[in-house]
Structures are given as C-alpha cells and as structure tokens.
Amino acid sequence: MELQGKTVFVTGSTRGIGLEIAKAFAKEGANIVLNGRREISEELIASIEAFGVKCVGVSGDISDFKNAGAMIKETEEKLGAINVLVNNAGITNDKLLLRMTEEDFDQVLKINLTGTFNMTQQVLKKMLKQREGVIINLSSVSGLMGNAGQANYAASKAGVVGFTKSVAREVAPRGITCNAIAPGFIQTDMTDVLSDKVKEQVTQSIPLQRFGSVEDVARAAIFLAKSPYITGQVLNVDGGLVMHG
C-alpha cells in the first residue's frame, strides 16, 4: 500500500514504540491518529503535523468494545476511513506465577489481547467494504519463547500471534493483510529501569549483542504496510534472539 494521504490509527501512541511508529508513517505522508487513555496533548499533535500531514488525537480505552467502536467512528468523522491499524497498546504486570492474582492476569490480557480484538473487529467493518486495508499487531518475543515472571504478558502476546494468523486467513480474500511484529529487547523507558547487570546479561543472549531501538520496530511496521503479498506472518525485531528453523 502506498501510504501518502492514507489514514493510520496507532493505539498507545503517545510515547515509546507507538509514537515512533506514528512518526514513521507521518514521514511517509500518512495522516495519523494518535491514541492513548488520556487526552492527547496539542504539543504531541503538533509534532506529527510538523511532517506536513494531518493528525488528530483520539483518547479512550481499547479494552472496552463500545469505546473502541466510538474511537473508530470519531476517526472516520475527522479523517475518513482508516487504511492502516497498528495495535500497539499494551501493558505489563510482571510477577512470578504463584504471586500473580487473577486480576493481575486478566488485566494484562484485557488490554493486550482483548483490546487488539476490539480494535480489529471495529475497524474491519469498513475495511471489508473497502476491500483494502492493513492490520499490524504488536506481539513480543515473550509470546514466542516465554519468560519467567511474565506468564500473563507472554500468554497475551502468544494470543496475539494466533489471533493475527486467524484474522489473516479470514480477510485475505478481501485484499486485507494482517501481520504481527515481535520486538525483542528494545531501548525504551520500560528497559531503562533494568540494572546494568541485567542489561549486560540480556545483551550477552542477543546475537547482535545490543538492544534494539524504537526506530527498528517502526521500520518493520512501514515494511509490512507496504508489502501487499505478506500476510499472516510474525516479523521478529530482536537482534536474532529468536531464530526459527
């Protein structure tokens, strides 16, 4: 898909990976919908408009199905039909399994997996009529290989992989692609809190011997959006941490 003038909705895009993905699409000439649970600041909107594109902020809770629908409707009223949906929003709540409450588990799945379902189903209603569209879901290497203390997060991200492949099969006849990106250890405020010792241990496990950048993930999103013959795939952006035979 050529991105000039298209409308791209990126959930959880007020900072980190989501914001960088939004900027990358703006650089390609796409109009951007910034999203978060709180009201989007005018300064943030202006930073995207500086690329010469339109940008609106749409706040709301993706884990609420009706709220997800309302956000899609608001976007369509302001910018027209959505051409690309990037399901980036996600949370963590790391604890060892025996210390994890039912609420700890459910909360992470509700945002990471149910939220992805909510936004995808709501946006597909019009995409199917358009017979064109791109859906990109953010998974994680944790969903591919597991990680101690992340049973809830890994389960949610593994669910995103299965969801992505199933949706891809359903919508392919209408010319819509659905893929996932599985980032590894990416330098963000979430990894900044790790101790130097932990960072060194992690780095030693990565073949490329370094953390990735938010730009690495954003480039993967642009690649998938521009690749109409790739669907149902999981693109690892992890420095070689997970290698499939």
Show where each model-derived region lies.
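Active-site helix of classical SDR
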Residues: 120, 156, 164
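C-terminal substrate-recognition "lid" of short-chain dehydrogenase/reductases
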Residues: 124, 132, 210-237, 242
